[in-house]
Amino acid sequence: MIQIQNVSKWYGSFQVLTDCTTQVSKGEVVVVCGPSGSGKSTLIKCVNGLEPIEKGSIIVNGTKVNDPATDLPKLRSHVGMVFQHFELFPHMSIIQNLAIGQVKVLGRSQDEAHERGMKLLDRVGIKMHANKYPGELSGGQQQRVAIARALSMDPICMLFDEPTSALDPEMITEVLDVMVELAQEGMTMMVVTHEMGFARKVAHRVIFMDHGQIVEDAPKEEFFGKPHSDRAQQFLSKILNH
């Protein structure tokens, strides 16, 4: 589904990604973790072309992302992306936020988009807030709206870039519960997160990054049980002891 091959990227003279290679199979959940500045958010943004790469290749469902001929807006309509900050339209109601992409990109009628949007809001537990505006909702509720909005486009896979890091601690669980449910339903997911409980529960594999490199790429049992690198061991001892 997602193939990342020898990907390198620079910001000016600073190399942010170095020769990264991995893949995510259909139905697989892969968690990407690592210290701040390790390149994990940059890597996931490269997957749908939000960040260009200078070297290597990324293929999503048979489409080469870094090919100049690739229609990136079309590709992104099939790849759901949920960010740290919710990126909702503040001047639109919740249901309007879910309908606009379906109508403008997928060509659905307003009625179809509304019906699909309401089903998804029900699924993430906020159907009762459909006519409210984003500013009237908590951070956790807004992030659940963002997930529902991504799902409304019927994506073939979902990318999450630290979806809980901007939330108050008590709101994190409500977002993770939705993500766990998605994973259990077989959605292909690539998730940048520090939530190791989530990784232990639903990840098939864990990728650990440091200084722009993939240091570990292992089944979760192996990663949590016996990571190969000293750097991953240090990271886990710090993050799991707090």
Regions found by a protein language model. Name each.
Residues 1-220:
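ABC family nucleotide-binding domain
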Residues 211, 221-242:
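C-terminal boundary and immediately downstream tail of ABC-type ATPase nucleotide-binding domains
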